[in-house]
Amino acid sequence: MAFNLRNRNFLKLLDFSTKEIQFLIDLSADLKKAKYAGTEQKKLLGKNIALIFEKASTRTRCAFEVAAFDQGAQVTYIGPSGSQIGDKESMKDTARVLGRMYDGIQYRGFGQAIVEELGAFAGVPVWNGLTDEFHPTQILADFLTMLEHSQGKALADIQFAYLGDARNNVGNSLMVGAAKMGMDISLVGPQAYWPDEELVTACQAIAKQTGGKITLTENVAEGVQGCDFLYTDVWVSMGESPEAWDERVALMKPYQVNTNVLKQTGNPNVKFMHCLPAFHNDETTIGKQVADKFGMKGLEVTEEVFESEHSIVFDEAENRMHTIKAVMVATLGS
């Protein structure tokens, strides 16, 4: 079934129905097949797209740029030091300027209110590449990846757990997405790091309508039992103080995804997911600092799990591009 999402913003999954989200995932799968088959049709020819990045990025920037180029669009990258936003010019004014020059705008930055204001005043489709509260394009990629590794299951038949800092943008967005799609999600971590109570209540109400299930628990064994997928993210997010590491590592260490946690699912075919980047060894600057300070060569996930046959993180990363392409084509394409 086709949906007309033309000229819609893509700011958070709460704005979209179950059928609209499924449509975007299905479109992503179709576009992925077309790219692999060499039969892709350019739906964004002649379009100009602005990519605003107030936070650094690898996957999101590359995904937007490659997706746009594949579809025939031109992009302008505006980096953290490449604009006057918030310094000499408000987002409201920036939106009204860029909206007259560009056909679509991506924003990756800080508060959700910023991208909401951009979306309200730009007059063209605005896409959320990540804010402190939500990361909706990531969840489209996650759900496409789950479907690819579920042997024909529908999303509503999938059970998964997110371990660690569940109050961050990925934890929030996975909970919203699971509620919308009628999935069974467990958020497993210290209670102090559970999502905001108001958002949990809203998601519980959605899940009641879709047949989904949301569980919040501090008990790892309880949270992962029977899961098809285990998901985690870094314990300290972009923009947080380095001083947060001491307290965070102590709290989060019991929620590291390791081989014992995989076994606790009782599912020998369980898959591991991570939005990346991941601290799974000491081969990065931060990874080495953490190893030296805490005696841990992996934080949220061990090297053994990350490099195992259970890990599908690079399928997941690739799908960022296909799902972002679907969002742009659906909201902007001819």
From Swiss-Prot:
Pull one GO CC term from this UniProt entry. Answer: cytoplasm
Q: Which reaction does it catalyse?
A: carbamoyl phosphate + L-ornithine = L-citrulline + phosphate + H(+)
> Where is it predominantly found?
cytoplasm
Q: Which GO terms describe its molecular function?
A: amino acid binding; ornithine carbamoyltransferase activity
- State the top-level EC class: transferase
Pathway(s) = Amino-acid biosynthesis; L-arginine biosynthesis; L-arginine from L-ornithine and carbamoyl phosphate: step 1/3
Task: Give the UniProt subcellular location, in the record's own words.
Answer: Cytoplasm
Q: Does the keyword Secreted apply?
A: no
Summarize where carbamoyl phosphate binds, as residue positions.
57-60, 84, 108, 135-138, 275-276, 320
Give the Gene3D superfamilies listed for this entry: Aspartate/ornithine carbamoyltransferase
Q: Which UniProt keywords apply?
A: Amino-acid biosynthesis, Arginine biosynthesis, Cytoplasm, Transferase
Any idea what job this protein has? Reversibly catalyzes the transfer of the carbamoyl group from carbamoyl phosphate (CP) to the N(epsilon) atom of ornithine (ORN) to produce L-citrulline.
Instruction: Write down what this protein is called.
Output: Ornithine carbamoyltransferase
Q: Which organism is it from?
A: Vibrio vulnificus (strain YJ016)
* Gene that specifies this protein: argF
